[in-house]
């Protein structure tokens, strides 16, 4: 059992659920669902990580699958959700469904053993698109678009957690910075 990892993963899970509950309730239904798929897939992976770091090793495959789900379906949902935020669009069933189909397709493909190595590429490209959309939102003078840029910058810093290994435990650092990133995404849509 690694207590610090249990605490940091639990903090990430609580932050994801709490941010969704607190910040996203006023959004239109399908927009809220897109944000929810992003936040809650991360939270589900964090819950599985909490259990795994607590010493229960039976969830390793589930934990790996949930991480893949967050980096495929979650990323595709955040890209479309941020696009809708920047363009001030209300998502319809067709675009929502298409986003889910693309995300689930990416998830299934990334589960294949030969393709699994490309999972970081998919999430990196998705986060890059979110950053570009955030900058586009700043150019369009969208209120709170700066929070999208801050959230993406925090996500990028979290992925470089190994660089801070001398100062912090990389796994805990990743969890806490990603939790701050989720809060920044919440601040972006806050009224």
Protein language model features and the residues they cover:
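N-terminal topogenic module of multi-pass integral membrane proteins
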Residues: 1-61
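Membrane-helix interface and helix-disruption motif detector
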Residues: 1-6, 54-66, 89, 111-122, ...
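Residues within membrane-spanning alpha-helices of integral membrane proteins
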Residues: 9, 36-46, 75-78, 96-100, ...
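Hydrophobic cores of alpha-helical transmembrane segments in multi-pass inner/ER membrane proteins
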Residues: 9-21, 71-84, 126-135, 175-190
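Membrane-interfacial loop-to-transmembrane alpha-helix junctions, especially the N-terminal start
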Residues: 27-42, 88-98, 140-150
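Aromatic-anchored segments of alpha-helical transmembrane domains
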Residues: 41-48, 100-111, 150-162
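Membrane-proximal helix-loop-helix units in multi-pass membrane proteins
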Residues: 64-133
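C-terminal transmembrane-bundle signature of multipass membrane proteins
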Residues: 136, 140-191
